[in-house]
Amino acid sequence: MIISASTDYRAAAQRKLPPFLFHYADGGAYAEHTLRHNVSDLAGIALRQRVLNNMSELSLETKLFDETLSMPVALAPVGLTGMYARRGEVQAARAAAAHGIPFTMSTVSVCPIEEVAPAINRPMWFQLYVLKDRGFMRNALERAKAAGVKTLVFTVDMPVPGARYRDAHSGMSGKNGPLRRVLQAMTHPEWAWDVGVMGRPHDLGNISKYRGNPTGLADYIGWLGNNFDPSISWKDLEWIREFWDGPMIIKGILDADDARDAVKFGADGIVVSNHGGRQLDGVLSSARALPAIADAVKGDLKILADSGIRSGLDVVRMIALGADTVLIGRAFLYALAVHGQAGVKNLLELFEKEMRVAMVLTGAKSISEITRDSLVRELGA
């Protein structure tokens, strides 16, 4: 197997994983137009090539809050990561820490906070959903604090679950889902043994620690579905801001007015994100939304971005459009599914190499020198 880009990991992951798991990660909402535009819109951004600038000294290092990152990349929160590799959250976190970048743990991870945090030598980030069960939210925040988490990523673009039609076709949901998942596992023996057997318990660790009983896949879907809160408003977040004294990032911003509201709220950062095209189909890609948001709030808080980033070249494009740092989700998940921690390590090395090539050939010697002047044209211009 030749791995030269993140797309190779995607192809290999499709072969290795049971279809219900591959398509759960790979799919988006409705007809998946936004999912596709996240990638194609980034690919349509042309960089301005510059030469003869003595690029012998180059630095990808950047500062974010009180952290130093080896490059402006963090691993995004991805639910059920531990179903893609044995104790997957631990493996991904170790790869990120070894590369000098943050790992963001999902609320709905397989491994609990208490298993992942001690496995790495730098503080991880923790992602939290807005849920009706405020007791769970407080419990999760308290446990994250106790584990040394400094940065909270608060996801606000999921007041209701997205309509992900591909899940019904793949067996993740829909008629005879449990039976279809078992049959798929039987035809993927490598995954079935390594993750299905050796990766137990298949629990949602953060939730079961609070509820006091194991939570399987069906319980996960039911519990979350009943706990998303469509009544949420900025006012409801005030108690979290009072409770959490570390950096707080609001994830799921696609509109400049919402970005301004995040500044008023006192957020330390935002993530320009459409949830990887998994929530509302037909909204702007992150690449299209980012410039206007950067114009509105750049300098008032840190701007992160995700959705559609598949290479180090895409990282450079997002930075040029106004992001300070980017989050990668599917790309690292595919690498994790194929080769575990070593796969994520290799992926991050590929991203760094691709960033270095792009920076040398655009004349940017540091991350701060990647600006809109690095673009021939912006998307849609």
Curated annotation (Swiss-Prot):
What Enzyme Commission number does this protein have?
1.1.-.-
Pfam families registered for this protein in UniProt: FMN_dh (PF01070)
Q: How does it sit in the membrane?
A: Peripheral membrane protein
- Residues annotated as binding FMN are 106, 127, 155, 251, 306-330
Q: Which UniProt keywords apply?
A: Cell inner membrane, Cell membrane, Flavoprotein, FMN, Membrane, Oxidoreductase
GO MF annotations, alphabetized? FMN binding; L-lactate dehydrogenase activity
Reaction(s) catalyzed by this protein? Answer: (S)-lactate + A = pyruvate + AH2
Chain positions recorded as substrate binding sites: Y24, Y129, R164, R278
Q: Where does it localize?
A: Cell inner membrane
- Assembly behavior: Homotetramer.
Q: Which family does it belong to?
A: Belongs to the FMN-dependent alpha-hydroxy acid dehydrogenase family.
Q: Which PANTHER family match?
A: L-LACTATE DEHYDROGENASE, S -2-HYDROXY-ACID OXIDASE-RELATED
Q: What is this protein called?
A: L-lactate dehydrogenase
Q: Where does this protein come from, organism-wise?
A: Pseudomonas putida (strain ATCC 47054 / DSM 6125 / CFBP 8728 / NCIMB 11950 / KT2440)
Q: Which gene encodes it?
A: lldD
